[in-house]
Amino acid sequence: MTQVNEMEIELKEPLIPVEEYLAAGVHIGTQQKSEDMKKFIYRVRGDGLYILDIRETDARIKTVAKFLTQYEAPEILVVTSRQYGQYPAKKFADTIGAMSATGRFIPGLLTNPVLDGYIEPKVIVVTDPIGDAQVINEAVQCGIPVVALCDTNNMTKFVDLVIPTNNKGRKALSMIYFLLTREMLRIRGIATSLTQEDFETEI
């Protein structure tokens, strides 16, 4: 068993050691817990913070990578309005060859064909269902599946695949997008020398 700070768990063939997940703060949730995210929560800390189960995070990254590689890269749209998510999300999109929309999402981008910049992705990846609610609503209208990085407080009603993670921290977001990139490239048989630091914003 590996015991570091928050957890005493063992991962089978993890993408990275448990210690690296913990160092990036991937497991640190919020002081709110949604019913939807209950199954991904490991425990609650003395200070009221809910802690996510890294085993679920690791498994879901693998599942999402397999799911996304079923699509052609240009059919994938990666969206984030969250500040710390913008750099790693765009790095992920650029590396795998996907489309990206960072910052404020333009209403109608998926639903209004006459809008300049209108796009028709086959699948969408969002950093936070709260901040990225507009694109999720449009995806639902269009029948486009949604993959979302979800924290302990998120609702997942319109999310098809959840990656449970701290979706607010800079290091956590860079770690998740790095691992997702690396795993997708591995499945495609593409070698990479990228590291987590390559996905970390300098802000």
UniProtKB/Swiss-Prot annotation:
GO terms for molecular function: structural constituent of ribosome. It comes from the Archaea. Keywords: Ribonucleoprotein, Ribosomal protein. Belongs to the universal ribosomal protein uS2 family. GO terms for biological process: translation. PANTHER family: 40S RIBOSOMAL PROTEIN SA. HAMAP family: Ribosomal_uS2_A. One of its GO terms (cellular component) is small ribosomal subunit. Coiled coil: none annotated. InterPro entries: Ribosomal_uS2, Ribosomal_uS2_arc, Ribosomal_uS2_CS, Ribosomal_uS2_euk/arc, Ribosomal_uS2_flav_dom_sf. This is Small ribosomal subunit protein uS2. It comes from Methanoregula boonei (strain DSM 21154 / JCM 14090 / 6A8).
